[in-house]
Design a protein with these regions (language model features):
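M16 family metallopeptidases and their MPP-like homologs
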Residues: 47-49, 54-72, 76-80, 95-142, ...
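Metal-associated gating/positioning segment near the N- to mid-region
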Residues: 84-92, 99
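Short, conserved secondary-structure transition motifs
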Residues: 159-166, 258-271, 378-389, 599-600, ...
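Bacterial N-terminal signal peptides
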Residues: 6-16
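Positively charged n-region of N-terminal signal peptides that target proteins for export
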Residues: 1-4
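Non-catalytic, conformational "gating/processing" segments within enzyme and secreted inhibitor domains
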Residues: 149, 156, 210-242, 440, ...
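Proteolytic maturation boundary segments
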Residues: 19-46, 231-272, 279, 314, ...
């Protein structure tokens, strides 16, 4: 992936991919998405979907190629190619797509690679559609000559950094590698990971790149999807103009379906440098995507592990108390599928005991089967899930492309839902017996380093390749070398960027507001695009209301509130929520406790009645309290070993001071959580939860009158009390910079958190400072930090900077993860960029900043989530409903001189905390060269 962003690729990726909601089973909605499809003479499939709700369009280019089409010894190539395709093309120029995206106010060019496909997608204001089609065509037809050896060598480092960040430097990162190596034969294309191996990535040559492109990136292997507010007649003409002359490639034969083979059960173990809890994973070969049995397998895995009625929950979590949760899913790809079961046990639990409990849970299922009631409950979430997938044109475009690529039917997702709704109890039992019961499997035990005795008996050591840290192991690449190449001919001058279309008319949503008699303020936006209602009740306080010596009370209270009510057992409450097509979650953060709800509009009142029960009639179940405590302790233990989590926690301690409640993790510590009693939760609830400090944000297919009427019960029953949320002072910035180092032995990446206590969101300079930061590190691939550290040097997979104030000053932060052996060099480069930012900021930078921040307003209110965020800003900070327009005027009035003034005021490399989390043995001594004295070691 280009960025760490997940995109919904199907209405039903897997029932196990998200919490199961529910609908009334007697409802029979249409799951059809309207589309138009045509094919150019060169074989390019084009799919259009019209959505007039917002002045935006999503453009999605999907190639039917992933890691399954790679050659042995060149693993990771499809994914690396995804990276290369963003860098340059003949007419866009170097970094042209990212520069274009910034200028037109796009969401940012993004992409992802799977085993079987690679996609490139972005949402833009609809006046830029022709520009995007021109750009995507340039990538497909006028790209390959721009790839040179220096370009390839630099991007290898970026991809290797992505692997370090997502696989090598995180707990359990190598699990799937071990599973797939055993599940599929060596010559099976699913035997290796999409990210590939570091050795294979380094071995890739320029000839490999060109061969791969010419074989797979041809029109007859690509689908172009456009979804949003546009003229399809005009768009078709543009598609024909820009894509039509790209030559068709050789015909591509489909690969044969080839399920995994496990001739005998095999068990492996690995002592994980970052794991603090033992984890058992079991995997069985199953079926490929769209296989008739895949839908019953998804129902099976959901029933076995999700919810209070699940056999695995009852045995492993409630009875044996071996783990806080169990996860099982059926994952289908184009050629084969696999069913996996994962149990991350509590500290020091033997995985043999977990395996015995798994057998007991399977036996329970064999005895009891699945009831019609449970089957209906699992199916019930499909309507809500479907409508949630329609919340953005980007999601729709990806969904349509997925269906076209793999089923030759853009609307195939609707057939998948019908297939799920047709699954019977007999089907569920049959697929269990066919694919799971008594069948050979692969098992992995990932245990903390030094605790091999926790692994499953009979396990052999897994062969995991772990990268050594060697200074100077990678050659530096000059990013300024210009490629010399012969231009690819065209029938017209493609170097001329198309003009904008008609300027989009951005309509700010109409906001209604009402204060209830009990003091709660309600803010709403009617949104009738889909028949859903989404809302959140935000109760100010959260961590800020806690005793610093017993942190974690608010979090435990929030988690316990959904574990039953005075009227309903935990299982009964869960079932009632699911039967309404709803999800209800309660969480606690630093500044608030938040109830988040998603439901079908027709079930709004019934869902709200359950919210009332949860909020006003907590069960305070002692058994569930102990389970929640155990799960929280397990979560804390794991966070303590994650370098990114460590960096965030230690940075907060530097920013706020160790004695400030704001420096603490809302989860608490192992010691504080173990000391908390049920009476502590009751006392916190009684003292701090009041409508007088509550706000409700509601977006959905419901008008103000109905919404307010539905709140009559909550208005009457929830009595106000006097609650004062303390104001915790933020310290002043440091008077001089200092380097702080937290040691994670063997870390192959160093995690950076550089910054200082900065501004409150209510400060008059706050939004201007955000504008100032756009080119520094807030603009993604348009930012200097990304262009220098990732695109120029290949030091990192990603880096950003931001201001994160609330009602009180919050930090300015520069965050990244860099390969360990350039820790000093990367920090020096960041320091140089910050120091020189005022004088280097140019008129072109200002134009890019203005263009993005103004034009991106066309996307500002597209999704329900965006509208909820708008209401949050209004209710929390007292902003006007048209604050977006007010901010637009600030941007229009910005000058280079003002940016330089702001950067001089709020960017001072000499008054920051410079925190590094990494391998002290190899990196700590070098950091004195950063010029801030001897580093302070934190552990």
């Amino acid at each position: 992936m280009r960025t760490v962003v997940a995109i919904i690729l199907s209405v039903f990726v897997s029932l196990t991919a998200m919490p199961v909601a529910a609908q009334r089973v007697d409802a029979k909605p249409s799951f059809k998405i309207e589309y138009q499809k045509f094919t150019l003479p060169n074989g390019l499939d084009v799919v259009f979907h019209i959505d007039r709700s917002d002045p935006v369009v999503a453009v999605n280019l999907t190639a039917h190629v992933g890691s399954a089409r790679e050659k042995a010894g060149r693993t990771g190539f499809a994914h690396m190619f995804e990276h290369l395709l963003f860098l340059e093309s003949e007419n866009l120029g170097k970094g042209g797509l990212d520069k274009l995206s910034a200028r037109i106010g796009g969401s940012g060019a993004n992409g992802s690679t799977s085993r079987d496909r690679t996609n490139y997608l972005q949402t833009v204001p609809n006046d830029a559609l022709e520009k995007m089609l021109w750009a995507e065509a340039d990538k497909l037809g006028w790209f390959i000559n721009t790839v040179t050896v220096p370009v390839l060598e630099k991007e290898k480092q970026v991809v290797k950094n992505e692997k370090r960040q997502g696989v090598d430097n995180v707990p359990y990162g190598h699990t799937q590698y071990v599973i797939d190596k055993a599940l599929y034969p060596a010559d099976h294309p699913y035997n290796w990971q999409v990210i590939g191996s570091l050795e294979d990535l380094q071995a890739a040559t320029l000839d490999d790149v060109k061969e791969f492109f010419r074989r797979w990136y041809v029109p007859n292997n690509v689908t172009l999807t456009v979804a949003g507010d546009f003229d399809p007649v005009q768009a078709k003409k543009w598609v024909e103009k820009y894509f039509g002359e790209i030559k068709r490639g050789e015909d591509i034969a489909p690969l044969e379906k080839r399920p995994g083979v496990v001739k005998e059960t095999v068990k492996f173990f690995h002592e994980d440098n970052f794991a603090r809890l033992p984890e058992l994973t079991m995997a069985w070969p199953s079926v490929e995507q769209y296989h008739p049995d895949s839908y019953a397998l998804n129902v099976l895995t959901t029933y076995l592990t999700r919810g209070k009625r699940a056999p695995f929950y009852q045995v492993i979590v409630e009875d044996k108390k071996l783990a806080p949760e169990v996860t099982m899913f059926s994952f289908e790809s184009e050629l084969a599928g696999q069913t996996q079961l994962e149990v991350r046990a509590f500290a020091d639990k033997k995985l043999d005991d977990v395996a015995a409990a798994i057998s007991e849970a399977f036996a329970k299922f064999e005895k009891d089967g699945i009831s019609e009631q449970d089957l209906a409950r699992i199916k019930a979430g499909q309507e809500t899930q479907f409508y949630n997938s329609l919340s953005s044109v980007l999601g729709k475009s990806a969904q349509l492309a997925q269906g076209n690529i793999f089923a030759n039917d853009p609307g195939f997702a609707a057939k998948e839902i019908d297939a799920i709704l047709s699954v019977t109890a007999a089907d569920v039992k049959r697929v269990y017996e066919k694919y799971i019961k008594g069948k050979n499997f692969v098992a992995t035990s990932f245990v903390p380093k030094g605790k091999a005795e926790l692994a499953l008996s009979g396990s052999k050591r897994a062969e995991v390749v772990e990268e050594p840290i060697v200074q100077g192991a990678e050659n530096e690449v000059d990013p300024n070398v210009e490629a010399e190449y012969e231009k690819t001919p065209s029938t017209f001058d493609r170097s001329v960027e198309p003009p904008y279309g008609a300027e989009p008319q951005v309509k700010i949503p109409s906001v209604w507001e009402q204060k209830l008699r009990n003091g709660m303020r309600v803010f709403g936006i009617r949104n009738s695009e889909v028949p859903l209602v989404q809302y959140e009740i935000v109760i100010d306080g959260g961590l800020l209301m806690e005793d610093i010596n017993k942190v974690g009370v608010a979090n435990l209270m929030a988690r316990l509130m959904t574990q039953g009510t005075a009227k309903r057992t935990p299982a009964e409450l869960e079932e009632a929520i699911q039967q309404l097509g709803a999800s209800i979650n309660v969480s606690a953060g630093t500044e608030d406790v938040r109830i988040t709800v998603n439901t079908l509009a027709r079930n709004h009142e019934a869902t709200l009645a359950l919210v009332e029960e949860i909020l006003l009639e907590p069960r305070w179940d002692a058994k569930e309290f102990e389970l929640v405590k155990q799960g929280t302790v397990a979560q804390i233990r794991q966070i303590q070993a994650n370098p990114n989590a460590i960096a965030t926690l230690r940075f907060n301690e530097l920013i706020y001071g160790k004695e400030s409640i704001r420096s603490r993790l809302p989860l608490g510590t192992v010691e504080s959580v173990n000391a908390i009693t049920l009476d502590d939760l009751k006392a916190f609830y009684a003292k701090n939860l009041s409508p007088s400090v509550a706000r409700m944000h509601l977006v959905g297919d419901i008008d103000q009158g109905r919404a307010v009427k539905s709140l009559a019960g909550l208005n009457e029953k929830w009595k106000a009390k006097s609650v004062t949320v303390p104001t915790v002072k933020t310290p002043a910035p440091p008077t001089e910079s200092k380097v702080y180092f937290y040691d994670v032995p063997g870390a192959v990446q160093s995690v950076f958190r550089f910054g200082y206590p900065a501004l409150a969101a209510t400060d008059q300079d706050y939004y201007p400072a955000i504008v100032m930061n756009y080119i520094l590190g807030g603009g993604g691939f348009a930012s200097q930090l990304t262009q220098e550290l990732r695109e120029g040097k290949g030091y990192t997979y990603g880096i950003n900077s931001n201001f994160s104030g609330t009602k009180v000053p919050g930090p300015f932060t520069i965050a990244s993860g860099v390969r360990a052996n350039v820790t000093l060099e990367a920090a020096q480069l960041v320091k140089s960029i910050v120091e020189n930012y005022p004088k280097n900021f140019s008129a072109n930078d200002l134009a890019t900043t203005k263009s993005f921040l103004i034009k991106s307003n066309a996307r500002a209110f597209e999704t329900s989530g965006a509208k909820l965020n708008m209401l949050e800003n209004i209710s929390k900070y007292g902003l006007r409903a048209d604050y977006v327009k007010q901010r637009e005027q600030i941007v229009r009035g910005m000058t280079v001189e003002r940016i330089r003034e702001l950067s001089g005021k709020y960017l001072n490399a000499g008054r920051m905390y410079w925190l590094v989390v990494g391998d002290a043995k190899t990196q700590l001594p070098r950091l004195k060269e950063l010029g801030f004295g001897d580093p302070v070691r934190l552990n």
